Amino acid sequence: MIEADRLVSADSSGFEEAADRAIRPKLLAEYVGQPQVRSQMEIFIQAAKLRGDALDHLLIFGPPGLGKTTLANIVANEMGVNLRTTSGPVLEKAGDLAAMLTNLEPHDVLFIDEIHRLSPVVEEVLYPAMEDYQLDIMIGEGPAARSIKIDLPPFTLIGATTRAGSLTSPLRDRFGIVQRLEFYQIPDLQHIVSRSARHMGLEMSDEGALEVARRSRGTPRIANRLLRRVRDFAEVRHDGTISADIAAQALDMLNVDAEGFDYMDRKLLLAVIDKFFGGPVGLDNLAAAIGEERETIEDVLEPYLIQQGFLQRTPRGRMATVRAWNHFGITPPEMP
């Protein structure tokens, strides 16, 4: 099973990137959710503009699909500067990064997605650039090699990662601002779905938006993907208007249940309940029972189930919680 193939995957495709770009908020005033992040960034941006300085370097981390790229775009728009975008895996050589840095205008924003995947060689170049706005470049080889310094304009580096723990301490410590994005509350997701529906020219009731929001796993990217599929259903099977009932019919047809679980989530939980009496069950046994790789279970399926309190990871193996039993209408066994 490939994670990107799942309707409830938080990873994005190229098509979705283009589609979502058109409906993303452009300014903090339009930004929904993450109230603490929004209020802090308002102050930091306003202070930098009052001083005429570049904004401090910003690290944004959190699960995929929560709007790290959106926030980077908003910062650049609020500061009134250009945004240059790249990603960790693309910057293979020190020269790749040097070329981007030397083309920046004063106060520009350089956004590096998946910054935890920077190579050590590239990361070394980044340290003096972030700290002193200077590039240290080696010219020549062997005994004739010499270091030259190139001054850079003041700029803001925004790094985004789903794995903050994978960043090296020297890199992490050079970010003056660190923001964690949390899963969205249902009312905020409902607002996002309604806003996206308006941008797409859809007629959608508040209850319809709420139904989509409830099944979106706290993730705007998933909410927008589900909205597009509900739109298809409404246009083909009905008159295009999306009510709560039509949204529920569409999502049920797509095998996305009331908790946002798809077929694979339910298959894993039911295997623990039915085949292993609720657990504990070892990861290898569970992988064999559902026909998946253990890495897929650990990295793709488990995290959301554990976060939502449906699965427990114990020293003796995986266990289904009472909430998981109740979700399927099965009476949990009496605790000894």
Swiss-Prot record:
Keywords tagged on the record: ATP-binding, Cytoplasm, DNA damage, DNA recombination, DNA repair, DNA-binding, Hydrolase, Nucleotide-binding
Entry's Gene Ontology molecular function annotations: ATP binding; ATP hydrolysis activity; four-way junction DNA binding; four-way junction helicase activity
Domain of life of the source: Bacteria
InterPro entries cross-referenced by the UniProt entry: AAA+_ATPase, AAA_lid_4, DNA_helicase_Holl-junc_RuvB, P-loop_NTPase, RuvB-like_N, RuvB_C, WH-like_DNA-bd_sf, WH_DNA-bd_sf
Binding site for DNA: 294, 313, 318
Gene Ontology biological-process entries: DNA recombination; DNA repair
Location of this chain's protein in the cell: Cytoplasm
Annotated coiled-coil segments of the chain: none
Keyword Protein transport attributed: no
Catalytic activity: ATP + H2O = ADP + phosphate + H(+)
GO cellular component, as recorded: cytoplasm; Holliday junction resolvase complex
Quaternary state and interactors: Homohexamer. Forms an RuvA(8)-RuvB(12)-Holliday junction (HJ) complex. HJ DNA is sandwiched between 2 RuvA tetramers; dsDNA enters through RuvA and exits via RuvB. An RuvB hexamer assembles on each DNA strand where it exits the tetramer. Each RuvB hexamer is contacted by two RuvA subunits (via domain III) on 2 adjacent RuvB subunits; this complex drives branch migration. In the full resolvosome a probable DNA-RuvA(4)-RuvB(12)-RuvC(2) complex forms which resolves the HJ.
Family the UniProt entry places it in: Belongs to the RuvB family.
Domain notes: Has 3 domains, the large (RuvB-L) and small ATPase (RuvB-S) domains and the C-terminal head (RuvB-H) domain. The head domain binds DNA, while the ATPase domains jointly bind ATP, ADP or are empty depending on the state of the subunit in the translocation cycle. During a single DNA translocation step the structure of each domain remains the same, but their relative positions change.
Protein name listed in UniProt: Holliday junction branch migration complex subunit RuvB
Higher taxonomy: Bacteria, Pseudomonadati, Pseudomonadota, Gammaproteobacteria, Enterobacterales
Gene symbol of the encoding locus: ruvB
